[in-house]
Curated annotation (Swiss-Prot):
HAMAP family: IGPS_A (MF_00134_A), IGPS_B (MF_00134_B). Pfam families: IGPS. This is Indole-3-glycerol phosphate synthase. GO terms for molecular function: indole-3-glycerol-phosphate synthase activity; phosphoribosylanthranilate isomerase activity. It catalyses: 1-(2-carboxyphenylamino)-1-deoxy-D-ribulose 5-phosphate + H(+) = (1S,2R)-1-C-(indol-3-yl)glycerol 3-phosphate + CO2 + H2O. The gene is trpC. It comes from the Bacteria. Keywords: Amino-acid biosynthesis, Aromatic amino acid biosynthesis, Decarboxylase, Lyase, Tryptophan biosynthesis. Belongs to the TrpC family. Pathway: Amino-acid biosynthesis; L-tryptophan biosynthesis; L-tryptophan from chorismate: step 4/5. Its EC number is 4.1.1.48.
């Protein structure tokens, strides 16, 4: 079958896990739960507020680094992020490589009043209704994981439920596909999910080709304020930070430092 990439391996596990969950809770039941959930928050308004938005992530592990942090209480961590000034909280729900869960999403949603992102490998409509049922306001769609018709239909379904899609890209070609699908919020991941290699110049290469009305989020590679300022200078509206926060020892202060840098008068302003 040729050499499978890291992404291929993750997606194989995700499909099996979704099928197992759907065998327990039917699509019809998940749809009903989604309809009963409180209305989603306005993500775009939160991200368009002045300054560089910080999306802080509850992240236990990653395929590249293994276990990052033992997070006994994701709600407590999310509350610390919120009090540090995060605009939104990202929650990993993929269980095999990231040690995430929908329980983490539930705990975070109950603890904070800012938008919550379900970060996972979304390949089926089931997962979108599931995200809404568990209180997500936005979710991740990864262009590299989806053929174009699937990307477009999953984006449309996300928006039909009142949620926002953060559409993740790693190349100019993927960025073109995201725009073609109608994405209004695009995340540029410096990490190649097929090889796990990081290309820090990725954002600076892709961002100039994105329209000014598209909100641009830099993902991966933010270890401190210097990285945030560099991304801001390259045109980022926001940054998504996980590893640098969960390994910091003081997540609230780590977020607050980024937020302070991102709202400082000397910080480059997004072009919008």
């Amino acid at each position: 079958m040729g050499s499978a990439t890291v992404l291929d391996s993750i997606l194989e596990g995700v499909r099996a896990d979704v099928a197992a969950r759907e065998a327990v809770v039917s699509l019809a039941e998940v749809k009903a739960r989604a309809e009963r959930a409180p209305a989603p928050l306005d993500v775009m308004a939160a991200l368009r507020a002045p300054g560089i938005a910080v999306i802080a992530e509850v992240k236990r592990a990653s395929p590249s680094r293994g276990e990052l942090a033992s997070i006994a209480d994701p709600a407590e961590l999310a509350s610390a992020y919120e009090s540090g000034g995060a605009r939104a909280i990202s929650v990993l729900t993929e269980q095999r490589r990231f040690n995430g869960s929908l329980d983490d999403l539930d705990a975070v949603r109950a603890a904070v009043s800012i938008p919550v992102l379900r970060k996972d490998f979304i390949v089926r409509p089931y997962q979108i209704h599931e995200a809404r049922a568990h209180g997500a306001d936005l979710l991740l769609l990864i262009v590299a994981a989806l053929e174009q018709p699937a990307l477009e239909s999953l984006l449309e379904r996300t928006e039909s439920l009142g949620m926002t899609a953060l559409v993740e890209v790693h190349t100019e070609e993927e960025a073109d596909r995201a725009l073609q699908a109608g994405a209004s919020l695009i995340g540029v991941n410096a990490r190649n999910l097929k090889t796990l290699e990081v290309d820090r110049d990725c954002f600076a290469r892709i961002a100039p080709g994105l329209p000014t009305n598209v909100i641009k989020i830099a993902e991966s590679g933010v270890r401190g304020t210097a990285d945030l300022l560099a991304y801001a200078g390259a045109g980022a509206d926001g940054v998504l930070v996980g590893e640098g926060l969960v390994t910091s020892g003081d997540p609230r202060s780590a977020v607050a430092d980024l937020v302070t840098a991102g709202t400082h008068p000397s910080c480059p302003k997004p072009a919008r």
